[in-house]
């Protein structure tokens, strides 16, 4: 009985202390984390299918939207047909409404480029480039109208910080891959040193962008995956010397906090690699597909993967918090449901 009374008195004391907590301390604990900049991105969007994700994407109030490639599926040498497919996507009511509120950037992958797994050999690439730029409403006097390839960079200044978006073109200059006839995989790595992913001109441009970057974060958009390289589909790992070249450039350039965004795979995942000599880890955030996905995905090896693969229709969100120097990355789906999330701290 005495034990019960002692316990009851102790309970009341604890409850009393809880009730009289300093409200100022509570406000500090419950202080809402602010987001200074929001990137939404995605890839693999078939213009003939339903586009269910735009309302959910809009709920995240993105500062910008980035197409990671395969904006439409239009493998063709018929430019009139390609133009029709782009217009079909533009006519989608939800997408049209979205673009009136959010700035849109993007690069292409093979299916909007015009040739499945295509590269430098595609004979209609110059014409296809103009249609791609038309879709993005790029001005007729923009430098991209005269250059070879759709690569592009833009700085965003917010709250005394700069975020640089670097859009790579992994199609226009990419040389031949090596078919794998020994396994069930589509491709195997080229002999070391054989081939180029970006071409000499684009490599020099990228070097200049990184060396001269004053950005707190450098967002590099590659239509194909950079870190995941064991699956046998298109990936930077098919040209291992090009992987080394980009990693070495990130180290030598002094560019801060590079994050890679990729698509192509019809799955979404987040990969992370620590690189000797680099002050921060490389993250490759893959977001794919917006209208269709690899729903029968059974698994594949990726030694850099964080969390789980998402094989449902999805999009990617990056929330930048300059106060805490963090970037929170989310894989989301219909109704804004969160499938995976990861927060990286930066200096």
Which functions belong to the PLM regions below?
Residues 1-27:
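Bacterial Sec-dependent N-terminal signal peptides
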């Amino acid at each position: 009985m005495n034990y019960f009374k002692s316990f009851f008195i102790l309970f009341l004391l604890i409850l009393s202390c809880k009730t009289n907590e300093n409200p100022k301390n509570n406000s500090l604990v419950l202080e809402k984390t602010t987001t200074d900049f929001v990137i939404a991105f995605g890839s693999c969007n078939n213009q003939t299918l339903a586009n269910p994700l735009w309302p959910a994407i809009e709920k995240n109030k993105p500062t910008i939207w980035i197409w990671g490639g395969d904006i439409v599926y239009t493998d063709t040498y018929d430019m009139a047909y390609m133009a029709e497919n782009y217009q079909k996507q533009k006519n989608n009511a939800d997408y049209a409404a979205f673009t009136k509120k959010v700035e849109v950037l993007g690069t292409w992958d093979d299916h909007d480029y015009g040739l499945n797994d295509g590269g430098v050999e595609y004979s209609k690439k110059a014409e296809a480039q103009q249609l791609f730029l038309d879709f993005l409403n790029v001005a007729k006097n923009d430098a991209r109208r005269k250059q070879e390839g759709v690569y592009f960079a833009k700085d965003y200044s917010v709250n005394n910080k700069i975020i640089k978006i670097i859009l790579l073109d992994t199609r226009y200059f990419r040389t031949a891959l090596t078919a794998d006839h020994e396994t069930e995989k589509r491709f195997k790595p080229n002999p070391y040193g054989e081939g180029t992913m970006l071409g000499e001109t684009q490599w020099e441009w990228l070097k200049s962008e990184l060396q001269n970057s004053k950005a707190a974060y450098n967002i590099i958009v590659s239509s194909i995956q950079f870190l995941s390289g064991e699956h046998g589909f298109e990936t930077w790992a098919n040209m291992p010397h090009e992987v080394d070249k980009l990693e070495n450039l990130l180290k030598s350039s002094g560019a801060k906090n590079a994050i890679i965004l990729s698509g192509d795979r019809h799955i979404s995942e987040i990969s992370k690699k620590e690189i000797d000599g680099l002050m921060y880890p490389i993250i490759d955030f893959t977001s794919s597909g917006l209208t269709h996905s690899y729903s029968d995905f059974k698994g594949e090896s990726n030694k850099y993967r964080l969390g789980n693969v998402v094989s449902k229709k999805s999009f990617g969100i990056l929330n930048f918090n300059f106060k805490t120097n963090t970037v929170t990355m989310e894989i989301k789906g219909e109704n804004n449901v969160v499938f995976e999330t990861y927060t990286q701290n930066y200096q």
